[in-house]
From Swiss-Prot:
Pfam families: Glyco_trans_4_4 (PF13579), Glycos_transf_1 (PF00534). PANTHER family: SULFOQUINOVOSYL TRANSFERASE SQD2 (PTHR45947:SF3). InterPro entries: Colanic_acid_synth_WcaI, Glyco_trans_1, Glyco_trans_4-like_N, Glycosyltransferase_grp1. NCBIfam families: PRK10307.1 (NF007640), wcaI (TIGR04007). Pathway: Slime biogenesis; slime polysaccharide biosynthesis. This is Putative colanic acid biosynthesis glycosyl transferase WcaI. One of its GO terms (molecular function) is alpha-(1->3)-fucosyltransferase activity. It comes from Escherichia coli (strain K12).
Length: 407
């Protein structure tokens, strides 16, 4: 098939949506599909355009797929308004490269959310070219915005009503909606999408990469990061933004400062400088910050953690399913997850006892108790690893998805 992938995040971004979209495109091309990509220059999670890329110029790249990079506004400190301008700027700049694909006549257009701002252009191209459309939802942008109080006066405000109407239009006017969890599938149905048009397309893990991590690689990375051998590692690896509520990790580290533990915060994001300042003001010698590590180092990094933190604010847990969790499960890590019992993560922990420790969000007491509980467990979590092997293998997930969208 001729497949056009349209979304703001793409390789070489190392985390989150860009990583998964890039791996999907490589897999599709390797299966013999003709793939084109319309995207932006890499900027996430640093919120800074990568070296050798420009935020202001178009760029065409040839490889496994033909890629068009489109200009966009990248705020250094993303606020709600700046984030909307950021997403909108990509929707505008990518419109003409998108329309240019009419002559190519793609068979399928896969639009990756965020950003919903791109949905109208995708639908127009589909109408002009005869393509079928798939809107793949990695993040319910509107729900996340409302759940985190970023839309002003809550769900009844004009901004919230406008955003909800725009989202409804995007969801109802595509051929299929795919998303990454069962609860997010149910949410699509609640928003009016016909159940037969909803596709389960979870984030995957390259299971084999995480099954046989050499102890020597773990020791080498530990030495490189200058982490002591006589202390257990409480690891957070990923985006450092507003959805996570990492202030509570600072509080937890403060309460556990006299125990033989190191809180290792690995990653980038708009909230990192503020967290570093908080830790410095409290004199937390048991907390260290590190830049995002390379993808090659990820298996050793995750195996190094004695306890993994998957932290989100209340209200965000069902709008966003953390992609980092797939690899934590694959490596057999013990995770402490902050999520309400009714959410996807809460249900996961209830359905598969022992897969992780689930605690109340935004509670320092619960987080500290969860960390203590996780540290008492065997270092290798067989429940987590077996779940990953059964349900998160990359080849199985992508093969099922392509079968689903063939129609």
């Amino acid at each position: 098939m001729k497949i056009l992938v349209y979304g703001i995040n793409y390789s070489p971004e190392l985390t989150g949506i860009g990583k998964y979209t890039g791996e999907m495109v490589e897999w599709l091309a390797a299966q013999g599909h003709e793939v084109r990509v319309i995207t932006a220059p890499p900027y996430y999670p640093q919120w800074q355009v990568g070296e050798n890329y420009s935020a202001w110029r178009y760029k065409r790249e040839e490889g496994a797929a033909t890629v068009w990079r489109c200009p966009l506004y990248v705020p250094k400190q993303p606020s709600t308004l700046k984030r909307l301008l950021h997403l909108g700027s990509f929707a505008v700049s990518s419109f003409f490269p998108l329309m240019a694909q009419r002559r190519w006549k793609p068979d399928r257009i896969i639009g990756v959310v965020p950003t919903l701002f791109c949905a109208p252009g995708m639908r127009l191209l589909a109408k002009l070219s005869g393509a079928r459309t798939v809107l793949h939802i990695q993040d319910y942008e509107v729900d996340a915005m409302l759940g985190l109080g970023l839309a002003g006066k809550g769900k009844g405000g004009k901004v919230a009503q406008l955003a909800t109407a725009f989202e409804r239009s995007g969801l109802h006017n595509v051929d299929n909606v795919s998303t990454i969890s069962r609860s997010m599938m149910n949410k699509a149905i609640e928003k009016g999408v016909a159940a037969e048009n909803v596709i389960f397309f979870p984030n995957w893990s390259e299971i084999a990469r995480f099954q046989h991590v050499a102890d020597a690689d773990v020791d080498a990375l530990r030495n490189q990061l200058d982490l002591p051998d006589n202390k257990k590692i409480i690891l957070y690896s990923g985006n450092i933004g507003e959805k996570q509520g990492l202030e509570n990790v600072i509080e937890a580290a403060d309460r556990l400062r006299d125990e033989p533990l190191i809180f290792a915060i690995v990653g980038q994001g708009g909230g990192k400088a503020r967290l570093e300042k908080m830790a410095q003001q409290r004199g937390l010698r048991n907390m260290q910050f590190f830049p995002l590590q390379s993808y090659d180092a990820l298996p050793a990094l995750l195996k190094m953690g004695d306890c993994h933190l998957v932290v989100q604010k209340r209200g965000a847990a069902d709008a966003v399913l953390p992609s980092k969790l797939t690899n934590i499960l694959a490596v057999g890590g013990n995770a402490v997850i902050t999520a309400e019992a009714y959410t996807e993560l809460g249900q996961l922990c209830e359905t598969f006892p022992g897969i992780a420790v689930c605690v109340e969000p935004e509670s320092v007491e619960a987080l500290v108790a969860g960390i203590r509980q996780a540290l008492l467990l065997p270092k290798h979590n067989t429940v987590a690893r077996e779940y990953a092997e059964r349900t998160l293998d990359k080849e199985n997930v992508l093969r099922q998805f392509i079968n689903d969208i063939r129609g």
